[in-house]
């Protein structure tokens, strides 16, 4: 009888730690339905599966990553569950797309930004509203929120029906340089994650937001081959460094030059 109790307790402990390990790989929870009104989903017309995220910054413009560019992009706004459609969901397509570099020649580590002008403005609603551009760069150690419909497992491609959110920290750029040997000495890129691992953006989160104090500070760019690994934080395009370019394009200067 005692042996049975011991075995039962061991089984409970094993299940508990297995669950905690799984939580570390997943690294986040379902976003509150009202906390991501600026989060958009990028699809292609040929596929029903979203391939990237994006960020609504005003009624007519969306930010995403250059690596997310496709020929036939469809942009869904106001979505939470991919299975249950909100009444105020709106769909748009790009009218114009702007890049710091060609979407095919952006460097692996830099210039990963795309600015999309929608074919028609969207209306603010219960589940749709733009996010503020940054007034200052994020401080080292800031707790920021990353979100998206990307895969929630580091070992297999498992996409959730709803966006997941996780809190991560702004880390010193040297941490990412140590993790990625080819990362240049200077870059307009944010390094963000959890040093011990367990929370991270992952496949199909690219182009989505990194929100710090209610402002869009980063665009999900890339990370390690396996998400959420210790000392392998993610890389995020630094929005603050591209503010002049973004504002110039929106103001009508289509020849605006990105920062070097």
Swiss-Prot record:
Expressed by the venom gland. Pfam families: Trypsin (PF00089). Residues 19-24 form a propeptide. GO terms for molecular function: serine-type endopeptidase activity; toxin activity. Residues 1-18 form the signal peptide. Gene3D superfamilies: Trypsin-like serine proteases. Glycans are attached at residues 123-124. It is an enzyme of class 3 (hydrolase). It is found in: Secreted. Keywords: Disulfide bond, Glycoprotein, Hemostasis impairing toxin, Hydrolase, Protease, Secreted, Serine protease, Signal, Toxin, Zymogen. It comes from the Eukaryota. Belongs to the peptidase S1 family. Snake venom subfamily. Monomer. Snake venom serine protease that may act in the hemostasis system of the prey. This is Snake venom serine protease 2. The lineage of its organism: Eukaryota, Metazoa, Chordata, Craniata, Vertebrata.
